[in-house]
């Protein structure tokens, strides 16, 4: 008697299959992209996401006002039922969604004096040179689109 073959997918395989194909393809090609677990879960569950740029954190305001502003915007996004996906580059790796310590690292110019302002033209060089940087709206939009995030909010100083 033949038994049906059943295959159980691991939870990571189920998650991967639910992510946007552009993000899966970029990861498969070795693009250095890290998606925060909360953002990845929101993508899988089709929860509302808002992409946030980080240039205002790295270049727009002095510390600690820059950090307080970024955290305030993230809290506001959460208060309306969405998940914030603050986007930046750290050590040449694209971060879609930042940990609190990563956001502070980009904001604190005394401990990290070298973050660059990253527009779309600067992305490849920042990755190749393993730089840290705050993404402008144009660079943030590229990564948001890659991840399937349809809403972008820019911070204003």
Where are the regions a protein language model picked out?
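Glycine-rich nucleotide/cofactor/substrate-binding loop typically near the N-terminus or early
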Residues: 41, 54, 59-61, 66-125
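Short beta-strand segments
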Residues: 51-52, 88-90, 145, 152-154
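N-terminal mitochondrial targeting presequence
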Residues: 1-30
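Glycine-rich anion/phosphate-binding loop at the beta-strand->alpha-helix junction
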Residues: 128-157
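Generic N-terminal amphipathic, Lys/Arg-enriched alpha-helix
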Residues: 19-28, 48-60
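N-terminal basic/disordered segments at the start of proteins
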Residues: 29-43
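Generic structural signal for well-ordered, non-membrane alpha-helical segments
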Residues: 32-36, 62-70, 80, 130-137
């Amino acid at each position: 008697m033949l038994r049906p073959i059943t295959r159980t997918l691991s939870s990571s395989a189920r998650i991967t299959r639910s992510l946007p194909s552009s993000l899966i393809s970029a990861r498969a090609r070795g693009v250095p992209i890290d998606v925060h677990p909360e953002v990845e879960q929101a993508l899988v569950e089709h929860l509302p996401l808002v992409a946030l740029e980080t240039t205002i954190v790295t270049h727009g305001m002095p510390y600690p006002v820059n950090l307080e502003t970024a955290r305030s915007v993230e809290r506001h996004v959460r208060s309306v039922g969405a998940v914030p996906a603050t986007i930046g580059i750290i050590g040449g790796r694209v971060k879609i969604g930042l940990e609190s310590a990563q956001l502070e690292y980009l904001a604190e110019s005394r401990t990290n004096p070298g973050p660059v302002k990253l527009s779309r033209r600067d992305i490849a060089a920042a990755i190749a040179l393993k730089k840290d940087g705050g993404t402008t709206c144009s660079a943030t939009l590229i990564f948001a689109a890659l991840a399937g995030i349809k809403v972008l909010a820019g911070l204003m100083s």
